[in-house]
């Protein structure tokens, strides 16, 4: 209101004595005039002069305060109360210290206010009227209750009493009594008070009647009264009445305040009447009412909700230009609007501006920005924003978590996506189908179709209804694992939700094509055409591929016509190429028409060639090929068509096209020739491969790819000499066939025992500085190791090291074997140390290799230590490793360690098989540990392991060599006792032993006793026996 009186008054509250606020600096030291001692009185109170309550006595009495000190204390208390009142806001309960004229002071004393805001009679009247609210309605008459206040209350006092009421009935009754008083005079002020109180409790009908009464008594409503009425309508959602009343106010040219407009705008926006908010805002601007921060917040939000981007940004800019700092919700509105409008740079700029203001974004704003970063594939920014959310403790809802799962999936962080999904489930935030499907798609993209289907199954068990999109994802899963039945079931379920989309139809058609289900594919195309599914270009391509593969010329022609009529695809290169190449021979000037096509589609040409080849129409095929070679794309298009046939496994068509091209005298590209040669090599068609190779060499020198494929074909067909010759020839010409081809060739030569040729290739690679990769160097080193060329292997390794090619674990393992075989144990140890420092995972193979060379070098402590280290690192030795350890320990006469190793094998589930004990017997025999060898044979027999000639032959041979013929004879007899018939080798060995020892007679006796009856025409045994008889001068008895 404009009244000075009402603006100078505040709400009535009971008198409350506030406690003093303690302060460290609140105590004031007052010096006495006669002493330097300090006292600390209460600075906020003065003596009331009451002799019955004297001040406390002190040791040293205080002198009376001077006038200056009294004024200073009064001012201090005034400042304190002023500060307290400001801190309490509009509900301040402390009296206001004001300056009064002498006349006002006289009136103040007459009112007997005693420091209160109103006089005692006014306070009493307020309490009396308020007290009526506790009585039953109609039980008391206001005239009777207020009879004691007649002629005591001025008009202003009555307004104060009216203003301080809380119940609408008391307001109504008191206002009626007030109008009967002599001091009453009709005023817009008093009517405004009544309107405000009625409006607060929703008595709109009574407010309207009061407003009409105000007009009838001749009071012209001002801006405050009209604003009060408008706020009442707005508060209680009477928008139609509010806008009607607002039009009436405009007609009276009453200028409303900003707060009234804000009230109306806020009320309209709460009910989502954003169009009316905008209209009211424009009228507000037209009236020249200055908006404040809250006004702009409402208007920007309504513009954003209506999708008016330019207007919202303009209002937002005006808001900032006036010095207002937008709230987070305002920034969020314009950011979201910019993202929806596709103005991504503006959205990012607004977000960065908001962050520069120190405003922490809400999770809705973060979700909007994450969606933007996801659309623009700016995944690092998205993850950075998510990290900021965690740092600022902004709660991530399910929408945000779903976006992060998708982003993790796009980045290949499948484990992180799974962790986020599980965390969302743990927090009980997992409820939306989109989150489940996001996780399912991540699993699908990672190739884990089973997990993708598990997520969808989880949705079903939790009674989450499957949407159309869920069936699409299910179809993609089943199509990927080629489960036709389930895919068809998912497609039928999708069809029940509406017309299937082109992408899903394409998935089904591709599934039928991959599984060569031609009849199903044709039936499916027919059905979706009947259902009038909207084809996209990809679905058209797949359908055309089916028709061409099945040789359905008529259907293909109809499909081309259909594509040519559709505005969405008729300008596509694929469609244009098909249309132009359908009937080349029968069309006049077809060559010119095709040349007018800016670019031919390779896939379309391949389909047409496929169709004509399937049809057997060679004339059309030749015409298409001739035409393609005359276009701007030249041979590259044809070569890509041939390559596509090879990739799809349709080699016969590729061969046919290649034959036609050669007969027509046209030239294929090297990559295509190399591809076909490789195919011929895999099929062992060396004659055809050589024909293509020679055709390629007629025009120019074959390139690397052709030579590489030809060498590979030679190797596959077993023509290693030709492969070797081609490599050496190409190397002389400076052509490098590549590391892979060299590896294949050297490996093949090594396996066939052609070590000289392998060495020549290795030397050539070093001399010509041919670039090799890790696998290539490994192959050469291994080949030289097997050829026994240890120095060459060492040179290759040094070249590999100086060239900066990284070593693999195979490199280190092979070099340990090279230096170990060359008795260079120190270098082998150095290589093993390099392998440790490389950071590569050391496997059982390299440990076993190093342990073996330690054993051969006599360093058993190092071998045992390394074997223990291998086990500590979690590598469980296999049977070969244990056999090797048993062998080197037995050789070094470490019998205790051998027993422990055998026991460890049994504990770790490594079976001590025939080879284990055979190795042990051979080692014992070779190292002249005959007793241990015999014990081992006995142990094998006790374990029930079947014995063989091999177990005895090595021991028998060692005993014979040592001249221990009696032990040898005993071993021979044990063999017979074990049920093993000695073979010719054992017989020869023991008989030669008798001859060597010069004891021919014993040899003859042993022969006649043990062997003679079992010799079956063995000429080698017979020869030894003949020598025995000659030695004693006897003739052999026949």
Swiss-Prot record:
PPR repeat ranges, renumbered to this chain: 187-221, 222-256, 257-291, 292-326, 327-361, 362-396, 397-431, 432-466, 467-501, 502-535, 536-570, 601-631, 634-668, 669-699, 703-737, 738-772, 773-807, 808-842, 843-877, 878-912, 913-947, 948-982, 983-1017
A GO molecular-function descriptor: mRNA binding
GO annotation (BP), single: Group II intron splicing
Location of region: Disordered: 23-69
PROSITE patterns: PPR (PS51375)
Low complexity bias spans: 23-38
Pfam families: PPR, PPR_2, PPR_3
Domain of life: Eukaryota
Ranges of compositional bias, category Basic and acidic residues: 50-69
Entry similarity comment: Belongs to the PPR family. P subfamily.
Stated name of the protein: Pentatricopeptide repeat-containing protein At5g27270
Species for this entry: Arabidopsis thaliana (Mouse-ear cress)
Lineage per the UniProt record: Eukaryota, Viridiplantae, Streptophyta, Embryophyta, Tracheophyta
Gene: EMB976
């Amino acid at each position: 209101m404009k009244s000075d009186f009402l603006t100078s008054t505040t709400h009535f509250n009971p008198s409350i004595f506030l406690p003093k606020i303690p302060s460290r600096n609140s105590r004031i030291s007052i010096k006495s005039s006669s002493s330097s001692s300090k006292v600390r009185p209460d600075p906020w109170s003065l003596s009331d002069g009451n002799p019955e309550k004297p001040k406390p006595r002190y040791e040293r009495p205080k002198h009376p305060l001077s006038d200056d000190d009294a004024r200073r204390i009064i001012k201090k208390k005034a400042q304190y109360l002023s500060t307290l009142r400001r801190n309490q806001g509009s509900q301040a309960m402390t009296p206001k210290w004001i300056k009064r004229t002498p006349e006002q002071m006289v009136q103040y004393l007459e009112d007997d206010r005693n420091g209160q805001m109103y006089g005692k009679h006014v306070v009493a009247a307020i309490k009396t009227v308020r007290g009526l609210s506790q009585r039953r309605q109609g039980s008391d008459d206001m005239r009777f209750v207020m009879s004691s206040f007649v002629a005591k209350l001025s008009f202003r006092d009555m307004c104060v009493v009216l203003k301080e009421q809380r119940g609408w009935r008391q307001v109504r009754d008191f206002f009626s009594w007030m109008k009967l008083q002599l001091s009453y005079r009709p005023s817009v002020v008093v009517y405004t008070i009544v309107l405000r109180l009625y409006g607060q409790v929703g008595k709109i009908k009574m407010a309207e009647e009061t407003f009409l009464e105000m007009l009838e008594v001749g009071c012209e409503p001002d801006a405050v009264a009209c604003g009060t009425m408008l706020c009442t309508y707005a508060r209680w959602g009477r928008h139609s009445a509010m806008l009607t009343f607002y039009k009436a106010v405009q007609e009276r040219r009453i200028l409303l305040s900003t707060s009234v407009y804000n009230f109306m705008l806020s009320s309209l926006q709460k009910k989502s009447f954003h169009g009316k908010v905008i209209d009211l805002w424009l009228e507000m601007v037209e009236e020249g009412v200055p908006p404040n921060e809250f006004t702009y917040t409402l208007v920007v939000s309504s513009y954003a909700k209506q999708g008016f981007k330019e207007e919202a940004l303009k209002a937002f800019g005006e808001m900032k230009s006036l010095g207002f700092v937008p709230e987070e919700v305002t920034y969020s509105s314009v950011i979201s609007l910019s993202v929806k409008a596709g103005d991504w740079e503006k959205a990012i700029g607004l977000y960065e501006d908001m962050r520069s203001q120190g405003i922490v974004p809400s999770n809705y704003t973060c979700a909007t920005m994450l969606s933007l970063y996801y659309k623009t594939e700016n995944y690092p920014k998205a993850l950075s924003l998510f990290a900021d959310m965690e740092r600022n403790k902004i709660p991530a809802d399910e929408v945000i978590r779903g976006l992060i799962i998708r982003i993790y999936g796009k980045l290949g962080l499948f484990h992180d996506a799974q962790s986020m999904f599980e965390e969302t489930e743990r927090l009980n935030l997992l409820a939306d189908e989109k989150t489940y499907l996001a996780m399912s798609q991540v699993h699908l993209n990672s190739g884990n179709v089973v997990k993708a289907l598990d997520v969808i199954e989880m949705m079903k068990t939790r009674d989450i209804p499957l949407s159309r999109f869920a069936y699409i994802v299910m179809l993609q899963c089943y199509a990927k694992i080629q489960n036709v039945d389930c895919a068809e079931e998912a497609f039928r379920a999708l069809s029940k939700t509406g017309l299937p989309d082109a992408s899903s139809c394409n998935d089904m058609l591709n599934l039928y094509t991959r599984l060569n289900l031609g009849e199903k594919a044709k039936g499916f195309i027919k059905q979706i055409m009947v259902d009038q599914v909207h084809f996209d270009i990809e679905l058209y391509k797949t359908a055309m591929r089916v028709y061409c593969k099945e040789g359905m010329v008529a259907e293909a022609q109809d499909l081309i016509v259909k594509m040519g009529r559709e505005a969405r695809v008729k300008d596509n290169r694929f469609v244009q190429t098909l249309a132009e190449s359908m009937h080349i021979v029968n069309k006049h000037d077809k060559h010119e028409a095709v040349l007018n096509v800016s670019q031919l589609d390779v896939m379309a040409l391949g389909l047409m060639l496929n169709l004509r080849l399937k049809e057997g129409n060679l004339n059309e095929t030749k015409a298409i090929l001739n035409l393609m070679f005359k276009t701007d794309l030249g041979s590259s298009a044809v070569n890509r068509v041939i390559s596509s046939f090879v990739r799809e496994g349709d080699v016969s068509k590729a061969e046919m096209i290649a034959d036609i091209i050669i007969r027509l005298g046209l030239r294929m590209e090297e990559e295509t020739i190399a591809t076909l040669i490789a195919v011929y090599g895999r099929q062992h068609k060396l004659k055809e491969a050589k024909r293509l190779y020679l055709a390629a060499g007629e025009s120019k020198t074959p390139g690397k790819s052709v030579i590489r494929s030809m060498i590979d074909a030679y190797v596959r067909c077993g023509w290693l000499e030709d492969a070797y010759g081609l490599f050496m020839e190409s190397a002389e010409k400076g052509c490098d066939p590549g590391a892979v081809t060299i590896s294949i060739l050297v490996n093949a030569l090594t396996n066939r025992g052609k070590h000289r040729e392998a060495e020549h290739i290795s030397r050539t690679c070093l001399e010509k500085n041919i670039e090799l990769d890790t696998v290539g160097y490994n192959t050469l080193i291994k080949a030289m190791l097997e050829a026994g060329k240890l120095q060459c292997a060492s040179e290759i390794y040094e070249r590999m090291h100086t060239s900066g090619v990284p070593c693999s674990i195979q490199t280190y393992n092979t070099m340990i074997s090279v230096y170990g075989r060359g008795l260079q144990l120190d270098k082998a140890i150095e290589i093993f140390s390099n392998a440790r420092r490389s950071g590569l995972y050391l496997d059982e193979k390299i440990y076993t290799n190093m342990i073996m060379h330690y054993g051969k070098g006599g360093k058993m402590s190092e071998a045992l230590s390394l074997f223990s280290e291998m086990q500590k690192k979690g590598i469980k030795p296999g049977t070969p490793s244990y056999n090797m350890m048993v062998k080197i320990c037995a050789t070094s006469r470490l019998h205790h360690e051998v027993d422990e190793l055998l026991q460890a094998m049994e504990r770790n589930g490594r079976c001590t098989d025939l080879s284990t004990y055979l190795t042990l017997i051979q080692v014992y025999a070779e190292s002249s540990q005959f007793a241990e060898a015999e014990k081992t044979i006995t142990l094998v027999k006790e374990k029930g392991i079947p014995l063989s000639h091999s177990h005895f032959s090595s021991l028998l041979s060692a005993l014979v060599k040592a001249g221990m013929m009696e032990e040898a004879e005993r071993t021979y007899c044990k063999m017979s006792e074990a049920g093993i018939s000695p073979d010719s080798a054992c017989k020869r060995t023991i008989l030669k032993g008798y001859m060597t020892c010069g004891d021919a007679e014993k040899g003859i006796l042993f022969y006649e006793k043990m062997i003679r009856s079992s010799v079956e025409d063995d000429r080698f045994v017979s020869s030894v026996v003949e020598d025995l008889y000659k030695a004693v001068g006897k003739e052999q008895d026949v």
